[in-house]
């Protein structure tokens, strides 16, 4: 796998096209909870599938990051997942927070850039950050993720 360095334009093209393919699949009523709910509650699945796509396009290494936002109220707790490539945050589901109140309100559908205050809101435990090597067959949801990935690829061709 080649290391991403100075190819932000290529990375942006891949990522924006991937998000567009998911939106098109959703608009075409592709089956599955992933497409029905996207982007709400799909940041983990999306990050896994996007990581596989980037790996397939020889972009890496990729870090998977999962954090939790803790509000003042005990019930005010939200998880979010994104990827990091060469120090750049890659998030194509941030707009799932567009109806939340500040400080969690966020309406950017595709973000590629440095860490921002929004991402700093999420507490990342040591186990919440790991290298991503693509979809792995031993994962409990592997077949679902793989099926969704194949549908998305259909819209990228």
Kindly label every feature range from the protein language model.
Residues 1-157:
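A structural boundary/capping signal
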């Amino acid at each position: 796998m080649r290391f991403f360095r100075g190819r932000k334009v290529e990375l942006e093209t891949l990522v924006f096209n991937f998000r567009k393919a998911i939106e098109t699949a959703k608009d075409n009523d592709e089956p599955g909870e992933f497409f029905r709910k996207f982007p709400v509650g799909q940041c983990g699945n999306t990050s896994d599938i996007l990581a596989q796509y980037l790996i397939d396009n020889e972009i890496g290494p990729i870090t998977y990051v999962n954090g939790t936002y803790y509000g003042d109220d005990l019930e005010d707790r939200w998880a979010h997942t994104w990827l990091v490539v060469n120090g750049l945050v890659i998030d194509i589901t941030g707009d799932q927070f567009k109806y939340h109140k500040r400080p969690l309100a966020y309406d950017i559908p595709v973000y590629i850039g440095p860490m921002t205050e929004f991402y700093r809101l999420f507490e990342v435990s040591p186990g919440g950050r790991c290298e991503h090597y693509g979809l792995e067959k031993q994962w409990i949801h592997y077949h679902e993720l793989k099926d969704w990935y194949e549908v998305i690829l259909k819209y990228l061709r």
